[in-house]
A protein has these predicted regions:
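Glycine-rich phosphate/ribose-binding loops and adjacent secondary-structure elements
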Residues: 266-412
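Conserved, well-structured core domains of diverse proteins
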Residues: 1-174, 180-190, 195-207, 211-236, ...
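Active-site cores of enzymes that catalyze phosphoryl transfer or operate on phosphate-rich substrates
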Residues: 222-277, 281-282, 289, 334
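Flexible hinge/switch segments at interdomain interfaces of large molecular machines
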Residues: 138-142, 253-259, 328
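Glycine-/small-residue-rich beta-strand-loop submotif within the FAD-binding core of flavoenzymes
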Residues: 195-203, 251-258, 323, 351, ...
Length: 412
């Protein structure tokens, strides 16, 4: 394991008279190997001086090699090449049709298909929209069945926010702000907004970081804000808070979120304004009143089913119901999540969606409460699948990121 390094001084001597620049190169390589032996941080380099760097180089480019040359077109980790290619083609206005037949194995154990009719009809455009708003909502919202899921300013750039909202305005669908609140870039093109309020109460907090009803009223009464969504948890890291380091809190982000510059921007794991199902519903009623009667609901990734049953029971006891519930699947994405949370915490979308739909149906409230779904929805088949399982509409985040140019490098 040492001979490649030990050969470098011999090669330097052998080439000194013939090619001095080669001798200089081999001498430099000898010094690199000597430093590898003395450094205390990487045992691989101490055991394999000089050649150990090859291991790190190969490890560095492994994801790209695998994605471009080895990965199967249908390997969904997290999105398959075929899924990404479909979004890329449609985002660019290119031909997305395929010839010769499907590449899928129709007889595989995981094969899925839709049942068609022998008498197909042209779809009525009205069927692509739903009305969100319960009996206590004074300003129901006519929403598209496919929308932009929550992604915050700060996680996305100003230009990305602009592009998404411009698309929402052109396509007539809603744009979820994410818990980072409403930035000036969300307002440039006038696309419909769903204002997400997380545990940090960004955009609706006072100087001490407490919930501010006045700030809520100021933001929520804007004509562009169509609904308010309380974030209880997200699929990619349910039960986990978040920290935006002080170094990343720019002047724009600080102004948008209502946080001081030079300090970490912290999202606690849970809300401080409520702690029980009844208090959650009372908070929903309070936000609905502050917004002037706009639809208010919450987003969650299902954990213990009994906790959602508790919320459902509180709806019956108090008579207060959310206008909508968004079920976020554990397969959802985020900028950064601990591996254990991303891989092993939370209920996948299809299971969580069935639980929410069946629970609301069982207690007689399904007709009053609309249900959204988010988690790996990029095609019309993905959308139809969740609609068949009980959802009223679907949201997509990473699908729109692909449309913006995301390459799935997994280095968010």
């Amino acid at each position: 394991r040492y001979w490649p390094w030990l050969s470098t001084p011999l090669l330097a001597l052998a080439t000194l008279a013939w090619q001095p620049w080669l001798a200089l190169l081999f001498s430099a390589l000898f010094l690199v190997g000597l430093n590898d032996l003395r450094q205390p941080h990487r045992s691989v380099l101490r055991n394999y001086p000089l050649t150990g760097h090859l291991r790190f180089a190969l490890e560095y480019i492994r994801p790209e090699i695998r994605q471009y040359f080895i990965e199967d077109d249908e390997a969904e980790y997290p999105f398959s090449r075929n899924q990404r290619a479909l979004v890329y083609a449609r985002a660019k206005g290119q031909n997305d049709k395929r010839g010769f037949g499907s590449l899928k194995n129709m007889y595989s154990p995981n094969a899925e298909w839709l049942l068609h009719s022998n008498r197909p009809r042209h779809a009525d455009p009205k069927t692509f929209r739903i009305t969100i708003g319960g009996p206590n909502c004074r300003h129901p919202y006519s929403a598209s069945i496919f929308n932009i899921s929550a992604m915050s300013f700060g996680a996305l750039s100003a230009n990305a926010i602009r592009a998404l909202n411009k698309g929402a305005a052109a396509g007539g669908f809603m744009h979820d702000t994410g818990e980072g609140s409403i930035s000036p870039y969300h307002r440039e093109f006038g696309g419909d907004l769903v204002w997400e309020i997380g545990s940090g109460y960004f955009g609706c907090r006072d100087a001490e970081g407490r919930f501010s009803p006045e700030r809520v009223q100021e933001q929520a009464t804007s004509a562009q804000v169509k609904m308010i969504e309380i974030k209880l948890s997200q699929g990619a890291k349910p039960g986990h808070g978040g920290v935006l380091p002080a170094a990343k809190v720019s002047e724009e982000i600080a102004a948008t979120r209502g946080v001081p510059m030079g300090q970490d921007c912290i999202s606690p794991a849970s809300h401080s304004e409520f702690s029980t199902p009844t208090e959650l519903l009372q908070f929903i009623a309070r936000l609905r009143e502050l917004s002037g009667g706009k639809p208010v609901g919450f987003k969650l990734c299902i954990g213990h089913p009994t906790e959602f049953f508790g919320i459902a029971k509180a709806m019956l006891e108090t008579g207060i119901t959310p206008d909508f519930i968004v079920v976020d699947g554990a397969e959802g994405g985020t900028g950064a999540a601990p591996a254990e949370f991303a891989d092993h915490v939370g209920m996948p979308l299809r299971d969580g969606l069935r639980l929410v739909h069946n629970t609301l149906f069982a207690i007689g409230l399904r007709q009053r409460i609309k249900v959204g779904a988010s988690g790996k929805i990029v095609s019309s088949f993905d959308l139809l699948r969740v609609l068949a399982l009980g959802a009223d509409w679907g949201n997509s985040a990473r699908g729109f990121m692909f449309a913006l140019g995301c390459l799935q490098s997994l280095s968010c």
